[in-house]
A protein has these predicted regions:
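Basic/polar N-terminal segments that are highly enriched at the extreme N-terminus
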Residues: 1-5
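Acidic/histidine-rich alpha-helical segments that form the ligand environment
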Residues: 7-17, 21-28, 60-61, 79-132
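Conserved alpha-helical segments that form or flank metal/cofactor-binding pockets of metalloenzymes
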Residues: 32-75
Length: 132
């Protein structure tokens, strides 16, 4: 059975994943060049708000269940695939990076859903809603 500290730890992982996605979406929504990039840039810029909203929900839950929302010194980047490409017209690289980031988030939320089962139904429901 998972402890509250186990749940907080995994919520923090999910929180940082969302925050990193925000940073990379902002960077790529600005940096991409070319006619083919315009729709991707618009989509990424629009998704920043949703991803930041996910991070805020996670942060509130961390605090609610007794954790502390970490500051930037605790951040460890991990989204190699979503970094701005060397060739700023490489839209495909960004699309692949978005897919990789979303796959990682889905995996983390599923991990939390299993971890919370029978222990913390509110956090479990929050994670289920994030996947909806």
């Amino acid at each position: 059975m998972a402890s509250q500290s186990d749940i907080v730890k995994e919520l923090q992982v999910a929180y940082w994943m969302e925050m990193e996605t925000v940073m990379n979406y902002v960077a790529n929504s600005i940096n991409l060049d070319g006619v083919r990039a315009e729709e991707i840039k618009k989509s990424l810029a629009a998704d920043v708000t949703a991803e930041l909203g996910h991070a805020q929900v996670l942060a509130k839950r961390i605090k609610t269940i007794g954790g502390v929302v970490e500051g930037s010194m605790k951040f460890n980047a991990g989204q190699k695939e979503l970094q701005p490409p060397a060739k700023l017209t490489d839209v495909v690289a960004i699309i692949k990076g978005v897919i990789a980031a979303e796959d990682s988030a889905i995996t983390q939320y599923n991990k939390l859903i299993k971890l919370c089962d029978g222990v913390d139904y509110v956090t479990q429901d929050l994670c289920i809603q994030a996947l909806a």
